[in-house]
Amino acid sequence: MATSDINSVVIVGRLTRDAELRYLNSGTAVASISIAVNRSKKDGDQWVSEANFFDVSYFGKGAEGIKPYLTKGTQIAVQGSLRQDRWEKDGQKFSRVNILADSVELLGSR
């Protein structure tokens, strides 16, 4: 029996900038969000904090409704899936991993 692939992510972090809202040709709203997630790691005898940065895309009415509250420093929880975007420019290939949000929850402000 073959196993199914799973593509699911839950992440909590703080916005690194205010979210940007744009509209696709279809009229669908898209909020572009950038979040920083701190993690601790051991460096010798000490624990140090290291930030990881992630781009999030949130589509639809939910993006429109929450956008005014998505300001720099706000802590949010994101549930969604990962998507790899690939493109070519001037003969050079590029790729990036983006989180496609199914839900975004406000947790607090700075």
Located regions from the model:
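Single-stranded nucleic acid-binding surfaces, predominantly the OB-fold ssDNA-binding core
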Residues: 1-110
